[in-house]
Amino acid sequence: MSTHDPISDLITRIRNAQMRSKSKVSTPGSKMRASVLEVLKSEGYIRGYASVEHASGHNELEIELKYFDGEPVIREIERVSKPGRRVYASVKNLPRVNNGLGISVLSTPKGIMADHAAREANVGGEVLFTVF
């Protein structure tokens, strides 16, 4: 089954799994999804992820979700740039999420990164989603 917006699919799977207090969730594997998950892992929003190869040849990413005192670490995850309405931001206009308590994940010419890393690298790009 193909999906038209893999980032929205990934975000929805994470959000739904956390609402059901699942410890792990699987998603179809891709380089872009792995890059997004690497950012979420480095920022401390998920425990980790692993690529699982199936006998049929397709691979999946198994995401280990993170909880603190029984509550999900990700309180809010929201898509910003959508296929029908792309949102781009220069370095000067990168959004701050809840006064810096959350992050924006961007797709830049230097790869997918968090907003503070983009400021340090002095690059702007497409604002994929925000996490708090």
Curated annotation (Swiss-Prot):
The record, for Gene3D superfamilies, names: 3.30.1370.30, 3.30.1490.10
Q: Which GO terms describe its biological process?
A: translation
UniProt keyword annotations, A-Z: Ribonucleoprotein, Ribosomal protein, RNA-binding, rRNA-binding
One GO CC annotation: ribosome
Q: What GO MF terms are annotated?
A: rRNA binding; structural constituent of ribosome
The organism's superkingdom is given as Bacteria
Has UniProt tagged this entry with the keyword Ribonucleoprotein? yes
User: Per the UniProt record, which residue ranges are transmembrane?
Assistant: none
**InterPro entries for this protein:** Ribosomal_uS8, Ribosomal_uS8_CS, Ribosomal_uS8_sf
Q: What Pfam families is this protein classified in?
A: Ribosomal_S8
Q: Which PROSITE patterns match?
A: RIBOSOMAL_S8 (PS00053)
Q: Does the keyword Magnesium apply?
A: no
Q: What does this protein do?
A: One of the primary rRNA binding proteins, it binds directly to 16S rRNA central domain where it helps coordinate assembly of the platform of the 30S subunit.
Subunit structure, interactors included: Part of the 30S ribosomal subunit. Contacts proteins S5 and S12.
**What is the similarity comment for this entry?**
Belongs to the universal ribosomal protein uS8 family.
What is the name of this protein?
Answer: Small ribosomal subunit protein uS8
The organism encoding this protein is Afipia carboxidovorans (strain ATCC 49405 / DSM 1227 / KCTC 32145 / OM5) (Oligotropha carboxidovorans)
Upper classification of the source organism reads: Bacteria, Pseudomonadati, Pseudomonadota, Alphaproteobacteria, Hyphomicrobiales
